A protein has these predicted regions:
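Short beta-alpha connecting loops at secondary-structure transitions
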Residues: 206-210, 237-247, 276-285, 303-304
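C-terminal, non-catalytic "cap/extension" segments appended to globular domains
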Residues: 221, 229, 256-259, 267, ...
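Switch/coupling subdomain of P-loop NTPase systems
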Residues: 42-56
Length: 430
């Protein structure tokens, strides 16, 4: 645990100096959205240079963690840490080969679509070459979306939009507000992040976040709202263990709410063009994250079934896997070294090994629920609600089946979901 925490210590202390001011890495990253390309390039250089200072230390830290984890797995009677962790994480409903199917399906069915996003970006920004500091700026050249002003508007508009999906969903947030269970606005000295915290004794959860009136905050609120609804729906289950669901199920609740609420985002945006921008941004993001999830997961499999690897072999394996899931649309000339150590920025590899693919599995499930909703809203919401009520009293595939979807990572099924999102994006582009 102490070694795992060393990653956070190194990364959290990695401030850099910009315009004579010391700023954190997360704050520095916000400048990558600047419409000034020279500023973006400068901040990217500063971030890369600062990360490079930690590369050797983080490499050595991982060597220690890998050796320790391998020893733990041998002592427990396993041949490698991957197999040990599959059992430790309670992955009884899917296997290593299912994860490999997920990797392959993302590579073949999702990657071509995300490549199209990057090619559109290059064209809209009118660039000869897309560089690594060009991937975050809004391609419309318009100011950042502002869906609300202050926590009061965020709460009211979230309640209205979620209630339009199902009145009970909005009522859950209303009860939390009345009980003082919402702490939403960013304040000086407030801890970072956002989460829904279940309170099993009373059955009414608590939402914490750091809202700054952004589109991302809207998504965070309905995401955590999905977790909150899940908490309400499982409050009467007999055992606490039934209420604590695995991430493959918990994130299905929250990621689905992001998409189910999207038709009601006109509660946040009265301007039709802004509403379209917000929806397009959401759909592109949910697909674009999937190749990165597959990259990180496949890399972790390699790390632990090859426990004697050297630092150089690790870097080579990372580059090979990264290339498998790359759109090859960004020109990294002069910054190849930053790609070689990019895995070091992923907290999960250091602190919660093998925990990451669950987000990808749940995202595919959420897309399937949304597809059902677009065909038959009433029945889709009913099935979603019934699935959440189960808590963890059924297996993951049974919960997905109750929701009217499949726990499936085959190329054919993933292609169906990808084509559906693509068709919805095309409607927004009309």
């Amino acid at each position: 645990t102490r070694l795992q925490g060393d990653w956070s210590s190194d990364v959290c202390s990695s401030d850099l100096v910009y315009k004579n001011e010391e700023i954190t890495m997360p704050r520095a990253a916000t400048f990558l959205k600047s419409t000034d390309r020279n500023e973006r390039e400068l901040i990217y250089q500063l971030i890369v240079n600062r990360r490079e200072k930690d590369t050797v230390a983080l490499d050595e830290l991982f060597d220690l963690l890998r050796d320790l984890r391998h020893s733990v797995s041998l002592n427990a009677g396993y041949t490698n840490y991957r197999d040990y962790m599959f059992d430790a994480l309670g992955r009884f409903d899917y296997s290593v080969s299912d994860c490999e199917d997920f990797h392959e399906s993302i590579r073949t069915e999702i990657l071509p679509i995300t490549k199209g996003f990057m090619e559109e970006r290059k064209e809209r920004l009118q660039l000869d070459r897309l560089r690594p500091w060009d991937t975050e700026v809004d391609i419309s050249g318009k100011p950042a979306l502002k869906p609300f002003h202050g926590a009061r508007e965020l709460v009211d508009r979230s309640i209205r939009s979620m209630a339009r999906v199902q009145p009970y969903f909005g009522e859950c947030i209303r009860i939390m507000e009345q009980m003082g269970h919402l702490d939403l606005e960013s304040k000086d000295g407030k801890a970072p992040g956002g989460y829904n915290y279940p309170l099993y004794e009373i059955g009414v959860p608590f939402i914490f976040m750091n809202a700054v009136d952004s589109q991302r905050d809207l998504v965070t609120m309905v995401h955590e709202g999905g977790h909150a609804v899940h908490s309400f729906l499982t409050r009467d289950l007999e055992l606490t263990a039934f209420k604590g669901t695995p991430s493959e199920v918990a994130e299905l609740a929250s990621m689905s709410m992001e998409l189910l609420s999207m038709d009601a985002w006109d509660e946040f945006y009265t301007n039709a063009e802004e509403l379209k921008r917000a929806r397009k941004d959401q759909l592109e993001k949910i697909l674009s994250i999937l190749p990165w999830i597959a990259t990180v997961d496949k890399f972790q499999h390699w790390l632990y079934v090859n426990p004697k690897h050297s630092s150089a072999e690790r870097a080579a394996a990372w580059m090979q896997i990264q290339d498998e899931f790359s759109t090859h649309t960004v020109d990294y000339s002069g910054y190849e070294h930053s790609r070689k150590s990019a895995w070091q920025k992923q907290l999960h590899i250091y602190e919660v090994p093998f925990y990451y693919i669950e987000y990808g599995m749940a995202q595919l499930g959420a897309i399937a629920i949304w597809r059902n909703y677009k065909k038959d809203p009433a029945n889709a919401v009913k099935a979603y609600t019934e699935a959440l009520k189960l808590g963890y009293t059924k297996s993951i595939p049974e919960i997905y089946e109750t929701a009217g979807i499949r726990f499936n990572f085959s190329r054919g099924y993933v292609k169906e979901l990808a084509d559906f999102v693509k068709s919805e994006l095309e409607k927004l582009n009309d």
